[in-house]
Amino acid sequence: MDRIIQSPGKYIQGADVINRLGEYLKPLAERWLVVGDKFVLGFAQSTVEKSFKDAGLVVEIAPFGGECSQNEIDRLRGIAETAQCGAILGIGGGKTLDTAKALAHFMGVPVAIAPTIASTDAPCSALSVIYTDEGEFDRYLLLPNNPNMVIVDTKIVAGAPARLLAAGIGDALATWFEARACSRSGATTMAGGKCTQAALALAELCYNTLLEEGEKAMLAAEQHVVTPALERVIEANTYLSGVGFESGGLAAAHAVHNGLTAIPDAHHYYHGEKVAFGTLTQLVLENAPVEEIETVAALSHAVGLPITLAQLDIKEDVPAKMRIVAEAACAEGETIHNMPGGATPDQVYAALLVADQYGQRFLQEWE
């Protein structure tokens, strides 16, 4: 099996970089469709338009309808084709960005992505998650290429609720442990091959960055200011984790997240908040040293991520619910089968309950 790493063509990050969008995007195309969150366009549209105009580019702005569905993609395609746009810029949150990526793919044109939050590692990936108009999961759209450009304005990210940054840390915290597991098992990653040394190194750097800078970055996020620590964590959440998960591989942590979606209790928690508990579960499954489990739990707790089931509002009928979660996490095609030696529902059930016990014990010690 060949080793493969893939990543966006260019990654650009800085405070007020939105003012320089036009000059960065100019080499890709002259006429652009900008698909933006209505909320983001509310404060950024004039800046975006000025940036394009100053660079001599033609821009058409289309507010995102709210759901990354095939109908929404087709609607936006009509606007883009009428305006003869030769490239797409997505600006906003995850569904907006996934829509922009899918739209550009169907049109066969370049795409640039400008995330305004750092809550997941999705912006850099060659993947869009497609939903129905009602918001039900429809399918994964695997794209042939990563975005041509990912541009992150750290000042805009700093303006978002701090909990979103914490969720991004939760998502990124899994990257090293899942890549490490895939490296040990020789699993095939989403890039279509085995992981490279480079992908593993980025995944490990991601983890070390979160350990060193995570708590400091959260203090900045709570004050909505940009500091060197916040800059580093935004890069870890977005780029290091993005390349790390796609080319390093996913394992138990994300499968446990998917299992948790099979029960209603934790539905209102963010992706990364559920992944954080999934990471603790994976470490128990691997029989990791207790020091490693405690280090991960301590970082999670410090930035406000859940380390017990109760913190995910799973408080009643816990054993029965964990059976459901464990079965769903071990479904055919789930990433848990990338673990060395695989995993059975019984093993995952045990790991879920023990991870919860660890979390409860740490909370008693720390509080």
From Swiss-Prot:
Its cofactor is Zn(2+). Zn(2+) binds at D171, H254, H271. NAD(+) binds at D37, G94, K95, T116, S119, S125, L127, Y131. Induction: Full expression of gldA is achieved by induction with hydroxyacetone and stationary-phase growth conditions. It catalyses: glycerol + NAD(+) = dihydroxyacetone + NADH + H(+); hydroxyacetone + NADH + H(+) = (S)-propane-1,2-diol + NAD(+); (R)-1-aminopropan-2-ol + NAD(+) = aminoacetone + NADH + H(+). InterPro entries: ADH_Fe/GldA (IPR001670), ADH_Fe_CS (IPR018211), Glycerol_DH (IPR016205). It is an enzyme of class 1 (oxidoreductase). The keyword Zinc applies. Glycerol binds at D121, H254. Pathway: Polyol metabolism; glycerol fermentation; glycerone phosphate from glycerol (oxidative route): step 1/2. The keyword Mitochondrion does not apply. It comes from the Bacteria. Coiled coil: none annotated. One of its GO terms (cellular component) is protein-containing complex. Keywords: Glycerol metabolism, Metal-binding, NAD, Oxidoreductase, Zinc. Optimum pH is 5.5-6.0 for dihydroxyacetone reduction and 9.5-10.0 for glycerol oxidation. Optimum pH is 10.0-10.2 for 1-amino-2-propanol oxidation (for homooctameric form). Glycerol dehydrogenation is highly activated by NH(4+), K(+) or Rb(+), but strongly inhibited by Cu(2+), Ca(2+), the thiol reagent N-ethylmalemide, and the chelating agents 8-hydroxyquinoline and 1,10-phenanthroline. 1-amino-2-propanol oxidation by the homooctameric form is strongly inhibited by numerous divalent transition metal ions, p-mercuribenzoate and dithiodipyridine. Pfam families: Fe-ADH (PF00465). Binds 1 zinc ion per subunit. Catalyzes the NAD-dependent oxidation of glycerol to dihydroxyacetone (glycerone). Allows microorganisms to utilize glycerol as a source of carbon under anaerobic conditions. In E.coli, an important role of GldA is also likely to regulate the intracellular level of dihydroxyacetone by catalyzing the reverse reaction, i.e. the conversion of dihydroxyacetone into glycerol. Homodimer and homooctamer. Forms homotetramers in a solution containing 5% glycerol. This enzyme was independently isolated as a glycerol dehydrogenase from mutant E.coli 424 and a D-1-amino-2-propanol oxidoreductase from wild-type E.coli. It was shown later that GldA is responsible for both activities. NCBIfam families: PRK09423.1. PANTHER family: GLYCEROL DEHYDROGENASE, GLYCEROL DEHYDROGENASE 1. This is Glycerol dehydrogenase. It comes from Escherichia coli (strain K12). The gene is gldA.
